[in-house]
Design a protein with these regions (language model features):
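Bacterial extracytoplasmic/cell-wall-associated proteins, especially those involved in peptidoglycan
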Residues: 4-187
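Extracytoplasmic/periplasmic/luminal assembly and interaction segments
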Residues: 1
Length: 187
């Protein structure tokens, strides 16, 4: 555990100068956190924590990953946002993530709505929802991808490296629709 107060950490990460300098905003700053095991001294300051997370983020986005993000025409934060959707869409069968990522990229490229249940659940802030209903789709939120086209403003969770890489290595196919099996065992 860190001694520094969580409000202090929050303040450092949403500092307008830091956000602007590093191409983040308050919606997508969560993408600076790359899942890994990090060691910190208990008395690490908020400033040093932010500096370390930015260093890890920049290290993670190596030339190969940067080139792949460019190839699919997404910023790093957009990759993280899409990866968070893929993560929540398929959190059991990781081998299906590149296919799901490809499907969402196809929708983006065709200027379609993503119509992602996980983003709607995030918008509703009701994480007990197992099945999205038509009444749920009426919520007015930029995270309602049934209502608005394109990616939501930021990630809906901190995506795993596996999900980020699934987006960067998305399957090349023409799929734009999927249907989950009734028992949620796959698509």
């Amino acid at each position: 555990f860190l001694e520094v107060d969580s409000n202090e950490i929050h303040k450092y990460f949403i500092d307008p100068n830091f956000l602007k300098k590093n191409n983040f905003n308050t919606n997508n700053i969560i993408s600076v956190f790359i899942p890994n095991t990090y060691e910190f001294y208990w008395n690490t300051s908020a400033e040093k924590l932010r500096k370390r997370m930015l260093k890890e983020y920049n290290s993670f986005w190596n030339r190969t990953r940067r080139n792949k993000a460019s190839k699919i025409k997404l910023t790093y934060a957009e990759v993280s946002t899409l990866a968070s959707i893929v993560e929540k869409e398929q959190n059991i069968k990781k081998d299906e993530r590149p296919m799901i990522a490809g499907l969402y990229l196809n929708r983006i490229y065709q200027n379609m709505k993503l119509e992602s249940d996980p983003t709607l659940i995030y918008a509703l802030k009701d994480f007990s929802i197992n099945r999205v209903l038509n009444k749920d789709k009426k919520v007015n939120s930029p995270y309602n991808t049934y209502k608005y086209k394109g990616l939501p403003p930021g990630p809906i969770c901190i995506p795993s490296i596996n999900s980020i890489d699934a987006v960067l290595n998305a399957s090349d196919h023409d799929y734009i629709f999927m249907c989950a099996k009734e028992d949620f065992s796959g698509y």
